[in-house]
């Protein structure tokens, strides 16, 4: 009996591409998603056959695409970044935005919370990385002039390594940069990609970093040493990456499917593709010609904290939920 991923169900409420999915660290039944429909949806997971989750709340306030969303470690707040140039902090219980973070001069592409939730980092098309406190005050800006990126900053993440507080950023300038959080100084520039880098992920123990983008290659880096370890061929543009919390796996959302590698053997263990015809038949009993023609792909990914469930957001606004199963 092999272990693999099977489609458990779908979640439908967004009307445009799902740009980000945030899952709680306590494995509770609430997840949050962001979309180009300018909204954030708070979902209650029901795990039903027809619908894996139901919409609890739609959070609105951003005036343009919402590009990223993350959850605070207590699961009470969500933080979002939008093409309207702002970040917003949301009180999920009240369903309201409690704070706006204004300072970027162009689209915000990525946001992240530090492990203790006391610091916030954001990345933008204005080529800067900003560090904020939770009051919405910008404490530091890493800009293009000095050691900063020379093009759009597409993704930014905190490392979970508390001994060496670190920020990792990816950019359209084809580099990944590693920053000391204590003084916002550059620790290393990771060069190796031949096209823009759209996503970066840090392993659960903070030792590894994976990056991907236009060139269709995932590069794995040793964060402490600042050196390249190896590469994995996705052979398709990469939109999102995430490590599995309890297995030595890395997942990539590509334009040709979701690829999952076992990092020990460096082999592909899964290549998940959507069967739109079967999906249509399951939901309404009819597979239309239009359904078969539509090309969709995954743009966002996140695992449940226990590593049993993979949530994937697609260009058609649907969240597809994959579960570990035996077959």
Curated annotation (Swiss-Prot):
WD repeat placement: 13-44, 61-91, 103-133, 148-180, 192-222, 233-262, 293-323
UniProt superkingdom: Eukaryota
Any one of the GO CC terms: ribosome
Keywords: Repeat, Ribonucleoprotein, Ribosomal protein, WD repeat
GO MF term set: ribosome binding; translation regulator activity
UniProt family annotation: Belongs to the WD repeat G protein beta family. Ribosomal protein RACK1 subfamily.
The protein, known as: Small ribosomal subunit protein RACK1
Biological source species: Brassica napus (Rape)
Source taxonomy: Eukaryota, Viridiplantae, Streptophyta, Embryophyta, Tracheophyta
